[in-house]
């Protein structure tokens, strides 16, 4: 189960590799689902990153290892827990998203994230 104090891989080209989730802003529970807005602390970065280690950042969860039931027929699970870094106005920091994202993120009004990726599931 994905909850607070979980490490997330970053799936964009912002220069950050991993963040530690410290708060869920979408819900007031500990559980985290796809499409939730989270607050995290940077734990691992690239050498050329403009962001600094241990800064507080915002992110949107796009992939989880947990099984997701779609239309009561299909189960989807990904290989890792991933998020995309955004600013306070929900604009993405990176200019590309690596990997696939689910199509139902479009219904949650994350259209800017939806336009940066190539693969959908």
From Swiss-Prot:
Any Pfam family: Ribosomal_L14
Cysteine disulfide links: none
Location of this chain's protein in the cell: Plastid, Apicoplast
SUPFAM superfamilies (alphabetical): Ribosomal protein L14
A single Gene Ontology CC term: apicoplast
InterPro entries with a match to the protein in the record: Ribosomal_uL14 (IPR000218), Ribosomal_uL14_sf (IPR036853)
Keywords (A to Z) from UniProt: Apicoplast, Plastid, Ribonucleoprotein, Ribosomal protein, RNA-binding, rRNA-binding
GO molecular function, one term: structural constituent of ribosome
Keyword Membrane carried by entry: no
Chief site of localization: plastid
Biological processes, Gene Ontology terms: translation
Quaternary structure and partners: Part of the 50S ribosomal subunit.
Function recorded in the entry: Binds to 23S rRNA.
Protein family (similarity comment): Belongs to the universal ribosomal protein uL14 family.
Protein name: Large ribosomal subunit protein uL14c
Species for this entry: Eimeria tenella
Higher taxonomy: Eukaryota, Sar, Alveolata, Apicomplexa, Conoidasida
């Amino acid at each position: 189960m994905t909850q607070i104090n979980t490490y997330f891989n970053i799936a964009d080209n912002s220069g950050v590799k991993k963040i530690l989730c410290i708060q869920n802003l979408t819900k007031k529970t500990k559980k985290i689902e796809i499409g939730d807005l989270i607050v995290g602390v940077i734990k691992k970065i690239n050498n050329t990153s403009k962001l600094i280690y241990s800064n507080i950042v915002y992110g949107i969860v796009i992939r989880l290892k947990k099984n997701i039931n779609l239309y009561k027929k299909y189960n989807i699970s990904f290989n890792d827990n991933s998020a995309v870094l955004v600013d306070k106005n929900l604009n993405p920091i990176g200019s590309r998203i690596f990997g696939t994202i689910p199509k139902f993120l479009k219904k949650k009004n994350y259209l800017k994230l939806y336009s940066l990726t190539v693969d959908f599931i």
